């Protein structure tokens, strides 16, 4: 988590827990905190203040960790490692929609993983073919509450304390590294389409991405061009 804090210039911050609690996303007691409350909590959101000494984690007073942004990706990667160590050559696991594959399907073909349509949760807007990769999505439609006819989702920008308003509604990361895919699906969502595309261009050897903007445009990185099928009727752009 600390590595991704550095790599994303603080966009991924595992010390976001006080803000998440203020919004009720950790307690399910949902509410909209006022700006003064968030201003008082933001100084506690700074992963650079966390230090490691072997297996000991040192936190300043008031700083609390929320590893939800990488936990499922980390877990699925470790499960696949255990499978491989025990002679399993083909498998797929889904943890709350976080999909990780081991090898190919038993018949030798690639796994086909669908990506949920934010506008119609009963359908998919894309299908990607993968082997030995994770497919992990972060979306504004996954966890949210409504107050006074305004929707507030759970992907909080650690720089502002508010739900990210980046122009993206869904980000899917495809990578051999489930932990990376989990962390970056959140991070690129917060960055928004332009900065997310620039980040991918700097790290295209590590992952690919499928992103949907608020207006329904689908952005697909060029590494997926030959193994991604877009089924939505919206505009499609290839990021290269």
Language-model segment annotations:
Residues 1-240:
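Mature catalytic core of soluble alpha/beta enzymes
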């Amino acid at each position: 988590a600390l590595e991704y804090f550095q790599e994303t210039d603080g966009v991924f911050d595992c010390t976001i827990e006080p803000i998440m609690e203020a919004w009720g996303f950790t307690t399910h007691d949902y509410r909209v905190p006022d700006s003064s409350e968030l201003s008082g909590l933001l100084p506690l959101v700074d992963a650079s203040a966390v230090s490691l000494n072997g297996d000991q984690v040192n936190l300043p007073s008031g700083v609390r960790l929320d590893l939800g942004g990488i936990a499922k990706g980390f877990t699925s990667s470790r499960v696949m490692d255990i499978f491989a160590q025990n002679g399993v050559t083909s498998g797929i696991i889904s943890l709350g929609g976080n999909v990780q594959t081991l090898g190919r399907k038993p018949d030798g073909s690639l796994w086909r993983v669908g990506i949920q349509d934010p506008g119609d949760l009963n359908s998919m807007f894309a299908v990607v073919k993968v082997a030995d990769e994770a497919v992990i999505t972060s979306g504004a439609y996954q966890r949210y509450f409504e107050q006074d006819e305004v929707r507030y989702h759970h992907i909080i920008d650690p720089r502002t304390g508010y739900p990210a308003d980046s122009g993206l509604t869904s980000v899917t990361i495809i990578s051999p590294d489930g932990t990376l895919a989990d962390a970056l699906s959140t991070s690129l969502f917060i960055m928004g389409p332009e900065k997310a595309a620039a980040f991918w261009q700097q790290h295209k050897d590590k992952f690919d991405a499928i992103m949907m903007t608020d207006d329904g445009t689908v952005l697909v990185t060029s590494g997926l061009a030959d193994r991604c099928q877009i089924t939505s009727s919206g505009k499609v752009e290839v990021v290269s």
